[in-house]
Amino acid sequence: MPRNLSRIFLVLLALGLTASCTREPENAPPDMLQHVPADTPYVFVAGKRLPDGLRARLADHYAAQLAVQRAALLKVRTQLQASDEVAAATREAGDYFHVLDALLAEFEGRETADALRELGIEPVARSVVYGIGILPALRIEIADAARLDALLDRVAERAGLSVARSSLGEQAYRRIDLGGVDLVLSVTQTHLVAGLLTDAMFDRHLPLLLGQQAPARSLAASGEIDAMIKRHGFTGYGEGFVKLHDLTGILLGKGSGLNAEVMQALGAEPIALTTGCGALAETMTAAMPRLVMGITRADDQQVVTRGVWESTPAVAQYLGKLAAPVPGVGATYDGLLAVGLGIELPQLRNALDALLRHLIAAGSACEWVDRDGLEAMIPQLSLALGPMTAGLKGFNLKIDDVELDPDTLEPRNVRASLLAAIDDPRGLLALGAMFSPGLAALEIPADGSFVDLPQDLGLEDKTPPLKVAVRDRALLLLAGADDAGPDDWPRDAGTAAPTPLFAIDYGLLLLVERFGDLSERAATQLRSQGEIEMAEELTDQVAGFRQQARLFERQRVTLHASAEGLVMDQVMELR
C-alpha cells in the first residue's frame, strides 16, 4: 500500500506541469527559485506571465482535458485488469487507482477554467518542480486556499486515506505515511506546496520544503536558469533541466551535500555496479550530461518549445556531420502530413564506429561489455553502411490530401509525393529496370520533366496514377497529379535551416475535418462486428484529436544537431 500511495505525488506533479505558465514578468522569479537547492538534479520552472489571450485559451484547454480523465482512467484500469500479464500488478496498485479516481472525480463536468477555479485550482499558474535530493517537490500558485483545502479533504475521504495534520509555526500541513518516506501537502494563502520527505530527515527537511528555511545555496543565487535561458533562446515562460550525469553519480553513491544526505536517509544502497561498469556509466553520461527544455516562443499564433540533449564538443562534432540536406524536409507545409529524413550514412557509420570503439576501450573493466561482440559489429557496419548505401541521403513524403470511400474506407483519391534524395537516381532506376521490363522501357529525362509510370509494373489495381521525374540528385514520385511540372519540385528556398535530421508536420484540424466523422463510422462498424475494444480505442483516439484540434491547427517537430548537442523543436500553431 505505501508503495502505491507514493504515486499520489505524481498526480500532483502532473497538475503542476500542466500549469506550467505564469503570473509575474520576471524571467526566473526569485520567489520561486529561492526555495530550490542549487544542486537539484532536476527542475522545471514557469516564471513569466503568458500573453493574456493565450493564457485564457490554454486554461480552458487544460480544464477540458482534466474533465474527461476519470473516464479515461476507468478504461485503462479495465483493460489492465483484463490482461493476464499485468492483472496482478493492477490489483496491487488498487490504492493508487482509488486515490487517482477520487482526485479526477473532482474535475468531471468542469470543462472551463472558471469551473476549475471553483475548486481553488488555477489552471495556468506560476510553478516550480524540483528535487530535494532525488525526491520531488512542487510549489504552485493557487486560486483559492479554502476551496483547495476542501478539495483535498474530499479526495482523502473518498479514497480512504489516513492523513495526519500538523503545523510548523503557523503553517499547517498534511502528512501521509508512505513507509520510508512521507507525502507532505501544505496549502498557504497563495500556494500549494507538496513533496516527499524521508522519515529519517523529516524534521530537518520540512522547513526547507515549506519555504521557512532557505537552502544553503539556491538556484536563484546560482544564476543557472538565467544562463540556460540565454544559452538556448528560451523566453522565461517555462524551462528546466535534468542532469543525467549528476543523477548517475547520485545513484552510484557519489553524490554530495543534500543529494548524498537524502540517499543516506532513504537507506538506499548505491546501484550494484562493479568499479569498471560504474566508471563506464559515468563516462557515457558525461558525454551528454544534461537534458534541457523550454519555451522559445508563445503568442496568439504559436507556441514553440525546444528540447536539447547537451553534449561535449567532441560528440557535437559527430552529430553535426550526420544531417544530409533533403529538399523540402522541415520546410513550411500546409497539407495533411509531411515526414522526412536526411542522414549522411557514411557519417552515421563513422559515429557508430567511434561509439563502439569507445565502449570497447572504456568498458574494458566492465563485465557487461561484450568486447568480442562489439568488435564483430564494426566490420558489419562497413557492410551495411558502405559504398552500396552511401548515396542514399533521405526522403520527404508529403500527403496533401486523401479522399476515402465512406462505405469501404478505402482511398478513392490520393494527392501525395515522395522525393528520394540519391546521389545517382538514374542508377537506382537502372537497378529497378533489372527486375521490371516495363521500367526498363521507360525513358525518363534528366531535366525534371515528369513521365507517367505504366500500370504494368506490378502495382495493385487500386494504386492511383503515378508520375516520376529525375533532376540533379533527386527522384520525385507523384500520385494523383493530373498536370505536373516544375512547380511540383521543392524549391531550394524550401529546404530548412539548420538541416534537419528528421521532421514531421501534420495538420491536426485538417485531419479531424477529413477523417473524424469517417473514423467514428468505422468505430460503429467495429462495434457491430463485435470488435468492442478496437472500437473504443478508435473512439478515444478521435476524441483526443478533436480536443487538440480545438486549440491547435498544426504541429511540426524537427530534429537537428547543433554545437550544443541534439535539438528538438516543436511548433504548435494555434487556430
Predicted regions and their residues:
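Membrane-proximal interfacial segments on either side of biological membranes
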Residues: 345-351, 427-430, 511-521
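Broad, structure-driven detector of short, well-ordered beta-strand segments within folded domains
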Residues: 182-187, 279-282, 286-297, 390-402, ...
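Signature of lipid phosphatidyltransferase scaffolds
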Residues: 220, 229, 234-240, 502-504, ...
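Long, C-terminal catalytic modules of enzymes
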Residues: 249, 259, 264-267, 271, ...
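Single conserved position on a long alpha-helix in the C-terminal lobe of the eukaryotic protein kinase
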Residues: 43-44, 94-230, 390-501, 570-574
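Structural boundary/hinge residues at secondary-structure and domain interfaces
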Residues: 21-175, 225-288, 303-406
